[in-house]
């Protein structure tokens, strides 16, 4: 049975009945198929669930909670979504959530702390999501490289402090960089280890294979590429290790790291990730919301100011004007409100 609700027709009818805009409503559901459909609109989406698997986290709602009482409590506190997304969002002073995700490796379940979602280039939200832009610009060579390191460090710190309520953490490390590449997590891991008085494993945890870039690889290819790629030079019998990464796509790299840590005796491995790559990403209409330069007509991209980390849009034209995030948001919201198709009918088969 395939669920076609909510459709654009039902969406339009709800907006008309409530006299609201698309960006002023939120869908609440326990049904993952309904969730997938609801995510195709630029409305809020709340998923009510007792637990989240990694596969489910790859199609995540804006807000995830365990029940309707929990949802009411979160809204009363002003909680708006994932911790990372809330912290990075411009002018935000809201609270955010760290979502525990069940990550399966060789039949064993590991705790993954999810701080937000990452929308890749194929997702319609890619150029509409400040957190995704912050993550990718921060790790890509360019003017904004590293500009969000302190912000991301604070997110990791908050998560570790939360974990320490129920876990005795002994060691910390990040996914090792390929041979000859810069370790982007070096200073972050050093500070986290020092602040929490735990052992820094990065010096003894290394990548020994210059495996190919994983972006275009399948799940099977990724697993094969990183097989035996990571080596820990010492035993860590019984230790609880925190493993840090930024963007997780298939999880193949994290799995390879966990296998090596466990092989060297780790009792428990807990992952903390800035964002889980979001699958799907098809907008309900072929006319997805995008921002175009008013000077030259070319598409604009969200960028990060290298001085203060603020967001803006640019088409990179030498004589064209950039657009502030606030103004871009206003224009995109106007586009969204004008594009609801009211001719489609609802069907549940």
What are these regions (language model features)?
Residues 26, 167-178:
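Short glycine-rich phosphate-binding loop at a beta-alpha junction
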